[in-house]
C-alpha cells in the first residue's frame, strides 16, 4: 500500500528529510473493510516503523493515547520504540487512494523475540511489573488494550 510518494509525505509530516532507501511491508491485513499495515522504512540515516490504520474503524484518540503511554514507558527506561510527533501529536492522518488513514512513525528497535526461555519469561514478568507500576503511579488509563485486537 505504501509507495515512495506516500512515504515521502509521511516523513515530511514528521520533519524527516532523508533519502528513502527501502520500504518493506512487515504486515498487512484487511478484514471486513478494515485495514492495518506495518512497514519498515529504511532511509539514509534511520530505520523506522510506520503503522497505518484506517480512520473509519480505528479511533485516532485511542492510537494517540497508546502512543502517549508508550512514550511514558520510554521516558521511564522501559525498552520501547521512540515515537515521532507531527504538530505535537504522535498520530497523524494521510489520504491514500481517496481514503483517510491514521499514521504513526517510530524508531526501529530490533527484531521480535525468536527464542523463548525461562529467563526470558522472568525478564518479561519484571517488565510487566514495572509497566504496571508506572501506569498506576501516573494514573494513566487508555481504556482499551491493543488496536490490533479490533481487526482479529
State each model region's role.
Residues 46-141:
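ATP-binding pocket architecture of kinase catalytic cores
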Residues 145-152:
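Active-site catalytic-loop/activation-segment of kinase and kinase-like phosphoryl-transfer enzymes
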Residues 1-80:
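Conserved NTP-binding catalytic cores of kinases and kinase-like/nucleotidyltransferase enzymes
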Amino acid at each position: 500500500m505504501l509507495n515512495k510518494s506516500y512515504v515521502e509525505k509521511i516523513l515530511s509530516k514528521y520533519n524527516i528529510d532523508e533519502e528513502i532507501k527501502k520500504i518493506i511491508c512487515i504486515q498487512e491485513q484487511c478484514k471486513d473493510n478494515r485495514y492495518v499495515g506495518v512497514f519498515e522504512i529504511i532511509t539514509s540515516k534511520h530505520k523506522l516503523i510506520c503503522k497505518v490504520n484506517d480512520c473509519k474503524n480505528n479511533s485516532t484518540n485511542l492510537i494517540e493515547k497508546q502512543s502517549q503511554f508508550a512514550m511514558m514507558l520510554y521516558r521511564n527506561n522501559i525498552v520501547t520504540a521512540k515515537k515521532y510527533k507531527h504538530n505535537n501529536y504522535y498520530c497523524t492522518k494521510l489520504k491514500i487512494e481517496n481514503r483517510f488513514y491514521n499514521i504513526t512513525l517510530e524508531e526501529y528497535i530490533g527484531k521480535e523475540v525468536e527464542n523463548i526461555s525461562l529467563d526470558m519469561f522472568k525478564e518479561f514478568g519484571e517488565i510487566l511489573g514495572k509497566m504496571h507500576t508506572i501506569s498506576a503511579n501516573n494514573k494513566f488509563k487508555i481504556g482499551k488494550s491493543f488496536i490490533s485486537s479490533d481487526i482479529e
